[in-house]
Amino acid sequence: MESAKSRFLRYVTYYTTSDEFTGTSPSTERQKDLGRALMQELEALKLEDVHMDDCGNVLATLPASEGVDAPVIALIAHMDTAPDASGENVKPRLVRYEGGELKLNDTVSLTEALCPGLENHVGEELIVTDGTTLLGADDKA
């Protein structure tokens, strides 16, 4: 089975930047590309009632184990990314964070002031953008 990290690295490469001027939902048809990929994965995982609605929302049901009376749990996330920076041709990088400034490229860096809590991840492997695009991590995780 594919690891969560491998899936995530694949998900962030989908071009899902929103377009605030279309007046549609989703704001771009390409956002449904990720939705269709997620549907295939949910079906492969044997979830039931897998479908995408007209707004691009992907829904599926994971029933309780046989003989178990348990409530249904919903997992909800949006798939679009902000238009603040490009979301096309995302090139995620794996880096070991050693503390302090984390240079993404010659002109873009992450700092603990910009990213509160970054200091809690010293010594850990982080998935970051190359600084030319948004990663879309909050959307596609």
Language-model features, listed with the residues they occupy:
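Structural signal for hydrophobic packing residues in well-ordered secondary-structure cores
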Residues: 12, 16-19, 42, 46, ...
